[in-house]
Structures are given as structure tokens and as C-alpha cells.
Amino acid sequence: MLSSLSPYMANPRNTLSQVLNFGLVLSSAFMVWKALSVITNSASPVVVVLSGSMEPAFQRGDLLFLWNRSPRVDVGEIVVYNVQGKDIPIVHRVMRVFPDVPTTGGEDVEGVEASQKLLTKGDNNLSDDTELYAPGQEFLDRKTDLMGSVRGYVPAIGYVTIMLSEHPWLKSVLLGFMGLMVMLQRE
């Protein structure tokens, strides 16, 4: 087994170069992700559709591109939101926008900027999303719950992510394959 590693042990400078190149690729991908996050004002500027609740508009596995710089959301717009206490992004259409009223405990507050209140529903669902919201939550808050509005998509390419989450052993195989390719790469 160690004999197969002998070419890498013989030239440590080449091995170090390959490890640094691999680190450069990973850090570049991270920087691109963070730059997209800043540009779009969204913690997750790219998400994958995980269910069929938005069919026929979006299929399971579609890759969505988000934008969160618009101050307002309109009825009919497709948004991605997180429910408080859950980490799974939900992609649904805005069905109703409530009037902007800055409130705290039911009383108007002066000097507090109002945030839109939204009601959403999946195109393929029979009822609105109030059952999906956190207990006691009747609507989404534009500022705190929304990750962004959908501005574009690529069909089916997100299935890789779905496969990796549904079959954890694939992650190990993929990482092992990538590591092997880095080690076998000759410059």
C-alpha cells in the first residue's frame, strides 16, 4: 500500500504543490459563494427545490437563484423562506400581502420601520402555508423570514445535492474520488 505513495514521498515539493492547489480551489469556491451572498443580500443565494409543491413551475431538483435586495414583495412572486426553528428552505408563491404596520405586542410603534407580512402557498398544494409556519405564526415577515425571491433557475441540476443528502455514502465516494484525482494529477 505504501509503495503506491512512494512517487509522492519522493518529491515532497510536488505533493505540497498539489495540496495547496486543492486548498486554492476550495477557498476560491468559498469566496465566490460569499461574494454571491453579499451581492444578492441572501445567506443562500442558490437553493435546490426539494419537493414537488411548486410543480409545474419548478420540479424537484431545480436549482434556483435568489435575489433579496428588493424592499417589497408582490403577490404572485415566488419566494424562498425559512421557518423559525427549521433549516429547510421552502419555495412557495406569495398569495397575499398584508398592510405594513409596525407593531410590537399589538400596539403601533413610532420610529420603527414596517416590514411586509406575507402569506404563501405552494402551487401544487391545496391550502396555504400557515400549517408550515412556526407555532403561533400566521404570516411571514419580509425582513426576518425571507431568504430571497427567485430570479432564475436551472432545471434538474440540483439533483446531485438531493442524491448526496438522501444517500450519505455517496458523499464519501465523491470526496474519495476527488482526493484520488488530486493525488494522481501530474503537472
From Swiss-Prot:
Keywords: Endoplasmic reticulum, Glycoprotein, Hydrolase, Membrane, Protease, Signal-anchor, Transmembrane, Transmembrane helix
Stretches in topological domain Lumenal: 40-187
Cytoplasmic domain ranges by topology: 1-18
Membrane topology, record value: Single-pass type II membrane protein
Glycan attachment residues as annotated in the record: 125
Region (C-terminal short (CTS) helix): 173-184
Keyword Endoplasmic reticulum applies: yes
GO biological process: signal peptide processing
InterPro entries: LexA/Signal_pep-like_sf (IPR036286), Pept_S26A_signal_pept_1_Ser-AS (IPR019756), Peptidase_S26 (IPR019533), Peptidase_S26B (IPR001733)
Reactions listed under catalytic activity: Cleavage of hydrophobic, N-terminal signal or leader sequences from secreted and periplasmic proteins
GO cellular component: signal peptidase complex
Transmembrane segments: 19-39
Main location: endoplasmic reticulum
Protein origin, superkingdom: Eukaryota
Active site: 53 (charge relay system), 92 (charge relay system), 129 (charge relay system)
Subcellular localization: Endoplasmic reticulum membrane
GO molecular function: serine-type endopeptidase activity
EC number: 3.4.21.89
Protein family (similarity comment): Belongs to the peptidase S26B family.
Subunit details: Component of the signal peptidase complex (SPC) composed of a catalytic subunit SEC11 and three accessory subunits SPC1, SPC2 and SPC3. The complex induces a local thinning of the ER membrane which is used to measure the length of the signal peptide (SP) h-region of protein substrates. This ensures the selectivity of the complex towards h-regions shorter than 18-20 amino acids. SPC associates with the translocon complex.
Protein role: Catalytic component of the signal peptidase complex (SPC) which catalyzes the cleavage of N-terminal signal sequences from nascent proteins as they are translocated into the lumen of the endoplasmic reticulum. Specifically cleaves N-terminal signal peptides that contain a hydrophobic alpha-helix (h-region) shorter than 18-20 amino acids.
PANTHER family from the UniProt entry: SIGNAL PEPTIDASE COMPLEX CATALYTIC SUBUNIT SEC11
Free-text comment on this protein's domains from its UniProt entry: The C-terminal short (CTS) helix is essential for catalytic activity. It may be accommodated as a transmembrane helix in the thinned membrane environment of the complex, similarly to the signal peptide in the complex substrates.
Protein's UniProt name: Signal peptidase complex catalytic subunit SEC11
